[in-house]
């Protein structure tokens, strides 16, 4: 299977969620199933069926996270030689030269991407267009809205 790039922070968030699911939610669901069984007939026991459904979702998410972590290529940006270029894990300040709108993006793995937090996937058009360029460069990027010119204002590695 293909290794998936992931930042240290992204891997840590997944480990925290996995820990919560295994050590808090899973035991709670098992307790709920046990209590629901005590209420008698399981065919018409809504509490039992709800708890079993919740157990299925929990176990599925545990397997999904374990698989992601197993296949992750965790990249510590602080240990990379970057030559001041935009690379995976970098935080990049850009200005749209057509609108003068300024924005900062962190380039992360697919599973970490969250536009509300200004975290874009390494596979997004903007990230692909910025990779390999330096502060001060002007890049043309094909986006779903058409070609956009960006000036790279700042590149940070944290």
Swiss-Prot record:
Q: Which GO terms describe its biological process?
A: DNA-templated transcription elongation; regulation of DNA-templated transcription elongation
InterPro entries in the record, alphabetically?
Answer: GreA/GreB_C_sf, TF_GreA/GreB_CS, Tscrpt_elong_fac_GreA, Tscrpt_elong_fac_GreA/B, Tscrpt_elong_fac_GreA/B_C, Tscrpt_elong_fac_GreA/B_fam, Tscrpt_elong_fac_GreA/B_N, Tscrpt_elong_fac_GreA/B_N_sf
What range does the record give for the signal peptide? none
Please name the NCBIfam families in this protein's record. Answer: greA (TIGR01462), PRK00226.1-2 (NF001261), PRK00226.1-4 (NF001263), PRK00226.1-5 (NF001264)
Give the encoding gene's name. Answer: greA
Tell me yes or no: is DNA-binding among this UniProt entry's keywords. Answer: yes
Could you confirm whether the keyword Phosphoprotein appears in this record?
A: no
PANTHER family, per database record:
TRANSCRIPTION ELONGATION FACTOR GREA
* Similarity annotation: Belongs to the GreA/GreB family.
Q: What is this protein called?
A: Transcription elongation factor GreA
The record ties this protein, via Pfam families, to: GreA_GreB, GreA_GreB_N
| GO molecular function per UniProt | DNA binding; RNA polymerase binding
